[in-house]
Amino acid sequence: MHAAGRTLTSAFPRPRAPVWLVVPWAMATSAPVAAEQVTLPDVVVSASRNEQRRFDAPAAIDSIPVDPFTATSPLVSLSELTLTSPGIAVRDRQNYSQDLQIAVRGFGSRSTFGVRGVRLFVDGIPATMPDGQGQASTFDLANASRIEVLRGPFAQMYGNASGGVVQVFTPDPPKTGFTGRASTGFGSDGQWQAGVSLAGGNDRLGGTLDAWTYQTDGYRDHSAAKRYQLNAKIVAQPSTATKITGQFNYFNQPLAEDPLGLTRAQADANPRQAIAAATQFNTGKDVEQTQAGVVVEHQLTDLDSLNFRLYGGGRQLTQRLGFSGAAPSSAGGIVDLDRTYGGGALSWTRKTTANGLPLQWTAGLEVNGMRDARHGYVNDNGQQGALRRDETDEAADYGAYAQFNWTVHPAWEIVGGLRASMVRLRIDDHYVTAASPDDSGTSTYRNLSPVLGVVWHAMETLNVYANLGRGFETPTLTEVAYGPNGVGANLGLQASTSRQGEIGVKWESDGQRIDAALFDADSHSEIVPLSNNNGRTVYQNVDGVRRRGLELGWHGAFGPARRLAAGLAYTYLDAYFGDAFVNAQGATVAAGNRLPGTARHSFGAELTYKPWGQWMVGVEAKADSKVYADDLNTQAAPGYFIFNLKTGYTFKAGATQWYVFGRIDNVADRHYIGSVIVNEANGRYYEPAPGRRFFVGLRASM
């Protein structure tokens, strides 16, 4: 696939002057093109927590359509669906042990595992834990109907770690009859996917059930993975005023090998390789998660409605790290975690009038909690050795909020909100020795997050909006685990706070959509590594982190029957440290250094054409500029440009609708870095992306 020794090249020259020359403003970006459909979903709920047109939403928000039947990809990763959504960066690490990297306007870019800085939901149920750590791997994209991406100040209404909000929505069962869908597909590197989905119901009761599996040998050595998912949804409507939705989700990943990162020289020489430590310590993880929840929507009167949710679940994880962790002061090289979590929320919405014009407000209460039984063991060449860590970790998140949308004039709308949050983290250390002192302790964080904005409905086809807000992000349990000088927990670590502003415009007319925005976020007490010793990473706060930029999105459908569709997204992100600080190696990080894990320029485009109704052909393009891998800006992944080809054909045989599809990714077989591990302690920052690869599949629906 790749010639040894090929050099990574940059797709973007370094800009001679900053693009940022104007005051901060922001955007609600265009929804990306759905390759197999020309209509875009027009309803969103993330901005106001109630249904409204995306065009009218007073915030930067995308609604990404998902059609599991006519998608031309296996629907394993969120990165398959966000190509033409500006402002969000989703990097598939080709490492199912470490999950995706998701960043919204630069928030979340520094996470080395899981998702931080971005709040995740599925059908209104949180997929982010109370300490701010989330997992996107459990998303059931093969049964999704749309994905909403909310950016900017209004994301702060969701509380801790809300640099952005990503919500996945699944379809309700049909009101009449029965439907079924089956799919299978295979591709390069041993990829294989299969699934089945059933749905049926009537006006009062219905349900959906889908089961799905995916496995791969992995692009790199020691990167094989297997996943199984089972999801059920029951919708009951005992009256016209009440809707009850029950959900059950099961996720099992018994195999997820971790090839670990590479140095730049290793990535250039052989991007498929895994370092020796990966096989020596059998790095990877297995995880099993079960969750159930219920959402009740009740219309009290014509003006008032209630929404109630309750959920709970468990997660069991065993992870083998790339070192032994045998030192007496180490936390071990094998992590064994048994988690229980749950929560509930209640909100009240009232739609009324003021001076004869619409006024809507929503008030709510939320509580979420988690409890981890966490153990660490010596990694004895892939086998569990002696105990090195024994803790009970707890996190609780409490929130109260109120939001309003007030039309003060037929052309003007004022929007705002206020959220009070409290997050409490507790560590109870049961493994205390002379070399491993007591890490027990409690940290409590409180924050008040206001948001205020205005929308000008300039014309039927043009909206202009501006928002200001303030938010916060607490440390995770992992980040407060170890204190400076090897003594106790890091209870002095503060929550990061941010002030955000945006101004944006939305235009829609005759099958086309343009969205443009400028944004600015100024953060204080940002959380960065202070030291790393024997697997114990200590974190510190730094001030003056700035994220500002421009988002542009366009979508259009043209010609008879809208057979030609196109979309593109561009993001300019200027993210940097405003103040100097000392890093984990004792070196001074200069003021003005770029925030690692962020690309200054990102571009995505898609063009699809249907020569006739049953056949679709399309091309995709993606480019990122250079991404620094460390705070010192001494290591960087060069920019890249790739393009993909895809096609799909629909036909009918009897009562069954069939869809056959195929795609070739990275057609030019470019060698590039798909993601970086920010501030990796051993200098192995780079995770290469696959070269040219294919995937073909067949689906049936009845």
PLM segments and residue spans:
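Conserved C-terminal beta-signal and adjacent last beta-strands/turns
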Residues: V22, H222, V235-P238, N249, ...
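N-terminal periplasmic accessory domains that precede
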Residues: L78-L81, Q101-R105, V118-F121, Q135-S137, ...
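Short acidic/polar hinge/loop motifs at secondary-structure boundaries
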Residues: S109, G117-V118, I125-R151
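Transmembrane beta-barrel wall of Gram-negative outer-membrane proteins
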Residues: T179, F186-Q215, R220-D258, G284-Q299, ...
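Face-selective signature of the C-terminal outer-membrane beta-barrel domain
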Residues: A241-F251, D286-V432, I514-D515, R563-G567, ...
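Structural signature of Gram-negative outer-membrane beta-barrels, strongest in the C-terminal barrel
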Residues: F248, A354-N368, E391-D522
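Membrane-embedded beta-barrel scaffold of Gram-negative outer-membrane proteins
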Residues: E297, S305-L321, H457, N463-G469, ...
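Gram-negative outer-membrane beta-barrel transporters
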Residues: W348-T349, I414, M422-V423, R513, ...
